[in-house]
């Protein structure tokens, strides 16, 4: 029930946001003209000042009305929505942004209903006549209705909200709104709050004071920045490694969605966000800060651009204060959180990492059909921030894997096509994505920057390509079966138990020498393995490392081979102190013969119990049976 309610709220909020988002540049243009040409602006100009009022009183409401109508019924809905909005605009003396958000969709729904009723009932040759006159007549009727009803109603609502806001401000209660705003943002309602609520309120407020505090309540990047920096210094696991880059993206790029997964993995961190938001709003109220228009995206650069003359100090102090409060409180919670790592006598499991580990992803991927994937869409609420970054990461990995037949796009959830092959969304947005594209395959993730997720997805796509290639025709199947005995197969000689190494370089040397000893590679291949490790760690997570040579070392490979080495005391392979490998698998690949063997080993290592047994077994036969998934 709660999920359904949340989904309904998200859908409604998304609709409101979609009316505002396409017109953000108009808000910015209006704000910049305010900052330049108004009497308190940088270049006051009475002549050019006349351009400002028509934009806020006519242009913006009409565009919002058109956008709202077109969301319901295309261009016809947009046209009748614009006509209906004219009735709202002329009925009052205040900017009718809220009125346009009602009248536009009303016009769209009306024309959509009318078109459905007359479908297939208009005689040939009269379609254009009926379409044009029906839209004009219905538009006039709706404009009159909105003039006498919607306009006065919105004027009363605006007066009521204005009075309520004055009461809140007079009792200094505005900072308490963070208790609602910050948790709502985590559930991807940030665009709804900013563009559906605060933008209309801010514009009405800015007409009186030339700036408004409401433009900086949701868009303040300080609380999110403080949380991410705290993760960078005191966090554990994979998220701490990506938090530094995420902080830069959030602060300068204005993509607040990037810190949401950090809170979802540790819900207690919502407290620092609330405290940071409250402190920022308190400073704004105290120093009378605010912006001249919507700051979108919520970047420090956008905020500075929308800051009116004389308010830079108050706005910067507000952002800085919210950052410090969020950082200090987040650091305290993270530094003294001893539940991040659970240890037993034999095995170390990192909770934070397990939430985003490759094993979980592999298990999830087993239920999907990758045989006809040509288009992958990474989608988020607005289709511009977090999904764009996720798509960029996946696109690069797809290219590196030579999967040139697969294209990767980023898109807003409401714009998803019905026939998309595979759609990737945050787990909190997947239900909405399924509603928009019910016939597509959907995969959920918790963090758009999760490299392990994309690595495992690409691995599955590559495995599928190998499978399709091997099963393309019956003749290929027979040929593959005939050559099966000639391919590399894991045996007891390839399993080396009870090894010890003080560091990963020593471990790679041990594995490499066994590859040389068994005739798989030349001796210089070991140097290539060490060189490859310097480029990027071959640590896979889940106590496994997969060292191998560089592409240039192909000539040093005599034949395809794999060496499975067990290090019961572990060897640190990753950047984190807890990235300990107990199982080190060395690979020498002459061609693609190793892919199926590695795939089988990967499937065998899907279970925690299997990894733990392999890490401490003293029986080569048991290890071989576990790796090949055959009974002893």
Swiss-Prot record:
Its EC number(s): 2.7.1.197
Main subcellular localisation: membrane
Modified residues (Phosphocysteine): 380
GO cellular component: plasma membrane
Classification via CDD domains: PTS_IIA_fru (cd00211), PTS_IIB_mannitol (cd05567)
Localization, UniProt: Cell inner membrane
PTS EIIC type-2 domain segment(s): 12-341
Site location (Stabilizes the transition state in the phosphoryl transfer from HPr to EIIA): 532
Catalyzed reactions: D-mannitol(out) + N(pros)-phospho-L-histidyl-[protein] = D-mannitol 1-phosphate(in) + L-histidyl-[protein]
Post-translational modification: An intramolecular phosphotransfer takes places between His-548 and Cys-380.
Protein name: PTS system mannitol-specific EIICBA component
Protein task: The phosphoenolpyruvate-dependent sugar phosphotransferase system (sugar PTS), a major carbohydrate active transport system, catalyzes the phosphorylation of incoming sugar substrates concomitantly with their translocation across the cell membrane. This system is involved in D-mannitol transport.
Domain of life assignment: Bacteria
InterPro entries named among the record's database cross-references: PTrfase/Anion_transptr, PTS_EIIA_type-2_dom, PTS_EIIB-like_sf, PTS_EIIB_2, PTS_EIIB_2/3, PTS_EIIB_mannitol, PTS_EIIC, PTS_EIIC_2
Sequence ranges assigned to domain PTS EIIB type-2 in this UniProt record: 374-469
Domain PTS EIIA type-2: 488-630
Subunit composition and interactions: Homodimer.
Organism encoding this protein: Buchnera aphidicola subsp. Acyrthosiphon pisum (strain APS) (Acyrthosiphon pisum symbiotic bacterium)
Record GO terms (molecular function): kinase activity; protein-N(PI)-phosphohistidine-mannitol phosphotransferase system transmembrane transporter activity; protein-phosphocysteine-sugar phosphotransferase activity
Transmembrane parts of this sequence: 24-45, 50-70, 134-155, 165-185, 273-292, 313-334
Domain notes: The EIIC type-2 domain forms the PTS system translocation channel and contains the specific substrate-binding site. The PTS EIIB type-2 domain is phosphorylated by phospho-EIIA on a cysteinyl residue. Then, it transfers the phosphoryl group to the sugar substrate concomitantly with the sugar uptake processed by the PTS EIIC type-2 domain.
Gene Ontology process terms (BP): phosphoenolpyruvate-dependent sugar phosphotransferase system
Membrane topology label: Multi-pass membrane protein
């Amino acid at each position: 029930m709660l999920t359904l309610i949340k989904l309904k709220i998200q859908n409604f909020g998304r609709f409101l946001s979609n009316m505002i988002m396409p017109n953000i540049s108009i808000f910015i243009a209006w704000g910049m003209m305010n900052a330049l040409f108004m009497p308190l602006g940088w270049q006051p100009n009475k002549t050019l000042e006349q351009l400002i009022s028509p934009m806020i009183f006519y242009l913006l409401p009409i565009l919002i009305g058109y956008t709202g109508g077109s969301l319901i019924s295309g261009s016809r809905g947009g046209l009748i929505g614009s006509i209906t909005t004219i009735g709202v605009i002329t009925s009052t003396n205040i900017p009718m942004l809220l009125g346009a958000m009602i009248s536009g969709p009303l016009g769209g729904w009306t024309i959509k209903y009318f078109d459905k009723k007359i479908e297939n009932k208009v005689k040939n040759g009269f379609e254009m006549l009926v379409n044009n006159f029906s839209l004009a007549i219905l538009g006039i009727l709706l404009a009159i209705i909105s003039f006498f009803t919607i306009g006065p109603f919105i004027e009363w609502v605006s007066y009521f909200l204005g009075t309520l806001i004055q009461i809140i401000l007079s009792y200094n209660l505005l900072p308490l709104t963070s208790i609602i705003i910050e948790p709502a943002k985590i559930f991807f309602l940030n665009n709804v709050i900013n563009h559906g609520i605060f933008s209309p309120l801010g514009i009405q407020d800015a007409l009186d004071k030339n700036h408004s505090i409401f433009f900086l309540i949701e868009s303040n990047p300080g609380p999110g920045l403080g949380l991410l920096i705290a993760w960078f210094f005191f966090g554990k696991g994979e998220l701490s490694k990506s938090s530094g880059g995420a902080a830069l993206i959030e602060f300068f790029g204005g993509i607040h969605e990037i810190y949401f997964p950090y809170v979802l993995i540790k819900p207690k961190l919502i407290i620092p966000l609330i405290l940071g938001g409250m402190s920022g709003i308190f400073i704004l109220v105290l120093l009378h800060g605010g912006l001249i228009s919507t700051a979108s995206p919520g970047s420090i650069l956008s905020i500075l651009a929308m800051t009116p003359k004389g308010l830079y100090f108050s706005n910067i102090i507000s952002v800085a204060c919210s950052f410090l409060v969020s950082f200090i409180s987040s650091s305290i919670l993270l530094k003294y959180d001893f539940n991040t790592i659970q240890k037993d006598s034999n095995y170390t499991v990192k909770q934070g990492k397990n939430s985003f580990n490759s094993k979980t992803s592999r298990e999830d991927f087993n239920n999907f059909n990758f045989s006809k994937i040509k288009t992958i869409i990474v989608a988020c609420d607005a289709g511009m921030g977090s999904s764009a970054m996720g798509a960029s990461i996946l696109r690069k990995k797809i290219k590196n894997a030579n999967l040139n037949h697969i294209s990767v796009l980023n898109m807003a959830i409401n714009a998803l096509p019905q026939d998309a092959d595979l759609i990737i969304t945050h787990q909190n947005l997947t239900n909405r994505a399924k509603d928009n594209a019910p016939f597509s395959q959907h995969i959920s993730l918790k963090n758009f920057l999760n490299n392990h997720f994309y690595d495992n997805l690409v691995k599955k796509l590559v495995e599928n390509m190998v499978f399709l290639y091997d099963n393309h025709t019956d003749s290929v199947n027979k040929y593959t079966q005939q050559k099966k005995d000639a391919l590399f197969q894991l045996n007891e000689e390839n399993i080396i138990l009870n090894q010890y190494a003080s560091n990963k370089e020593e471990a790679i040397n041990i594995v490499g020498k066994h590859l040389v000893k068994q005739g798989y590679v030349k001796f210089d291949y070991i140097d290539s393995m060490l060189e490859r490790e310097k480029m990027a760690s071959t640590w896979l997570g889940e106590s496994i490392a997969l060292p191998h040579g560089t592409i240039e070392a192909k000539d040093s490979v005599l034949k395809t081979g794999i060496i499975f080495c067990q290090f019961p005391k572990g060897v640190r392979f990753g950047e984190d102190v807890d990235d300990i490998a107990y199982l080190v698998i060395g690979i020498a690949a002459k061609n693609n013969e190793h892919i199926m063997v590695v795939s089988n080993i990967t499937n065998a290592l899907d279970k925690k119990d299997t990894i733990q047994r392999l890490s401490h077994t003293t029986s080569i036969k048991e290890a071989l049976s576990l790796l090949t998934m055959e009974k002893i």
